[in-house]
Amino acid sequence: MVLLISYDLNGHERPEAYDDVAHVIRTNAISYRKPLYSQWFVETNESCQSWHEKIKAVTDTNDHWFICPVGSTRQGWLPNETWDWLNART
């Protein structure tokens, strides 16, 4: 399964907050692509709820994130290697 994870870390005085989320994704995903600054496509066997809990553990209450499965109906303008990666997994 491929999940889309998108987030906005609000009001952080810690620049490493984005690094904390990236570390969670890199260490828990089977594979991933990061086409935009705070957006990831994650290949995983875990649920959206499981990923929610992982991200919640390294963020603050004023942060926002969105997680959803990626299906075959989609459009966008992303690098070709991202499309190739998505097409191979969905």
Residue ranges and their predicted role:
Residues 59-89:
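C-terminal structural segments of small proteins and small subunits
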Residues 10-25:
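Short amphipathic alpha-helix segments
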Residues 9-12, 70-72:
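Short, flexible beta-strand-to-coil junctions
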Residues 23, 31-33, 81-85:
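C-terminal end-helix/capping segment
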Residues 27-71:
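Short, intrinsically disordered low-complexity segments
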Residues 1-9:
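Short glycine-/aliphatic-rich beta-strand segments at the starts of folded cytosolic domains
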Residues 12-15, 49, 76:
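Loop/helix-junction capping segments adjacent to catalytic residues or to phosphate/diphosphate-binding pockets
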